[in-house]
Amino acid sequence: MTDMQTPFVAKVVVHMGVGEAGERLVNAENIMADLTKGAKPIRSYARNTLPAFGIRKGQPIGCKATLRGKKAMDFLEMALKTYAVENVLHTRQFDATGNFGFGIEEHTDFPGQAYDPKIGIYGMDIIAVIEKKGTRTARRKIQQKKINSKLHVAREESMKFVTETFGIEVE
């Protein structure tokens, strides 16, 4: 397999949906900054008004952080060890383009995170984007081009990459 055909982790997105603004959102941002080793989380805002949940359009309801490079790999390894107790991911967690995601119900499952009754417990969603070198040519603004089908990451390729790189079985 050539260097252009080898998949890699392009980015990891960590998302925490709180559902309300205020102290809970600030606590979630602090937890995320601590877990991601200093990556500054940005706020996500409600797209629509949902009166049943007391959410107005434009209200901050969550936070997210994007990690790339070595930080992304380190965080993903730590998160997979936390999530996959039996070293298993399911095929339904992978999409058609090779990306995969999973959720962690309690931030206290991460090493070094203790329960604090003043803060509470927060869950998070983690999405890993798997790409091959050369895929940027399809996304860039100037001289955008189509890419060969060999540069697309297939679902099976991504599963094989996760198994070989992180030692996680895919069922």
UniProtKB/Swiss-Prot annotation:
A Pfam family reported for this protein in Swiss-Prot or TrEMBL = Ribosomal_L5_C
Which cysteines pair up through disulfides? They are: none
- Which BP terms from GO are recorded? translation
Could you give a GO molecular-function term held by this entry? rRNA binding
What SUPFAM superfamilies is this protein classified in? RL5-like
Task: Give the signal peptide range.
Answer: none
User: Any idea which UniProt keywords this protein has?
Assistant: Ribonucleoprotein, Ribosomal protein, RNA-binding, rRNA-binding, tRNA-binding
Per the record, its GO cellular-component terms are: ribonucleoprotein complex; ribosome
Listed PANTHER family: 60S RIBOSOMAL PROTEIN L11-RELATED
How would you summarize the oligomeric state and partners of this protein?
Part of the 50S ribosomal subunit; contacts the 5S rRNA and probably tRNA. Forms a bridge to the 30S subunit in the 70S ribosome.
* Record-stated family: Belongs to the universal ribosomal protein uL5 family.
Role noted for this protein: This is one of the proteins that bind and probably mediate the attachment of the 5S RNA into the large ribosomal subunit, where it forms part of the central protuberance. In the 70S ribosome it contacts protein S13 of the 30S subunit (bridge B1b), connecting the 2 subunits; this bridge is implicated in subunit movement. May contact the P site tRNA; the 5S rRNA and some of its associated proteins might help stabilize positioning of ribosome-bound tRNAs.
Q: What is this protein called?
A: Large ribosomal subunit protein uL5
Q: Which organism is it from?
A: Methanocorpusculum labreanum (strain ATCC 43576 / DSM 4855 / Z)
